[in-house]
């Protein structure tokens, strides 16, 4: 994927359909499956943040051009107006040349919904064991998956149970034992192996003793 920083508020991507498929996405589903389209978009924005220090914050104006060999996406950060922003991942409409363009404003509400889940990678399985014995909040959804030699914990919070500050605090505790992964959970689930599909930390705690 090519990333070009246009200015302080704008970044341009070019991603081929081959690259999209190599990331575990189908080139058609990203248009018709909103959740999958969002996953790809957030994965791309994470790379932009890592490579160009372009943070995903505030309202974003998105232009998508569907080209013959891939997608050209221009993302511009705007200013928050009246503190109310709405997120919507764009869907393109093709013209007679098989190319299309769509512009859309992202909404903060859906971005916050996306931010309530995280994929945590671990350098060693023992780090997961240590986490399980030092983190005793069991009423969050968590799944353990093995993918390409690494263990990943997919964690989903219930925003009706915990406040945003409480979730941030819990994430900070968990990230003391692992790292936030940029990989999509869909890619990990599709090509990896599910080790424990629910209550993973509880199961690990019960099956593996705490290290001395």
From Swiss-Prot:
Record-level Gene Ontology MF annotations: protein-macromolecule adaptor activity
Please report a single Pfam family linked to this protein: MecA
Q: Does the keyword 4Fe-4S apply?
A: no
Does this entry carry the keyword Signal? Answer: no
Cross-referenced Gene3D superfamilies = 3.30.70.1950
Q: What does this protein do?
A: Enables the recognition and targeting of unfolded and aggregated proteins to the ClpC protease or to other proteins involved in proteolysis. Acts negatively in the development of competence by binding ComK and recruiting it to the ClpCP protease. When overexpressed, inhibits sporulation. Also involved in Spx degradation by ClpC.
Q: What is the protein's quaternary organization?
A: Homodimer.
The molecule here is called Adapter protein MecA 2
């Amino acid at each position: 994927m090519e990333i070009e920083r246009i200015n302080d508020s704008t970044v341009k991507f070019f991603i081929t359909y081959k690259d999209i498929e190599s990331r575990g996405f189908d080139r058609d589903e990203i248009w018709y499956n909103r959740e999958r389209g969002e996953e790809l978009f957030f994965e791309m924005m994470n790379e932009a943040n890592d490579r160009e220090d372009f943070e995903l914050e505030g309202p974003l104006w998105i232009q998508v051009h569907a080209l013959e060999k891939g997608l050209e996406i221009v993302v511009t950060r705007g200013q928050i107006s009246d503190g109310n922003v709405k997120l919507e991942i764009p869907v393109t409409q093709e013209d007679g040349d098989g190319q299309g363009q769509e512009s859309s404003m992202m909404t903060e509400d859906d971005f916050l919904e996306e931010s309530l889940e995280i994929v945590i990678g671990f350098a060693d399985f023992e780090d997961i064991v240590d986490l399980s014995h030092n983190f005793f909040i069991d009423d969050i959804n968590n799944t353990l998956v093995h993918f390409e030699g690494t263990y990943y914990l997919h964690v989903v919070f219930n925003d009706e149970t915990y406040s945003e500050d409480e979730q941030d605090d819990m994430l900070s505790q968990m990230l003391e034992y692992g790292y936030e992964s940029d990989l999509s959970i869909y890619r990990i689930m599709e090509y990896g192996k599910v080790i424990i599909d629910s209550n993973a930390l509880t199961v690990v705690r019960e099956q593996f003793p705490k290290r001395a």
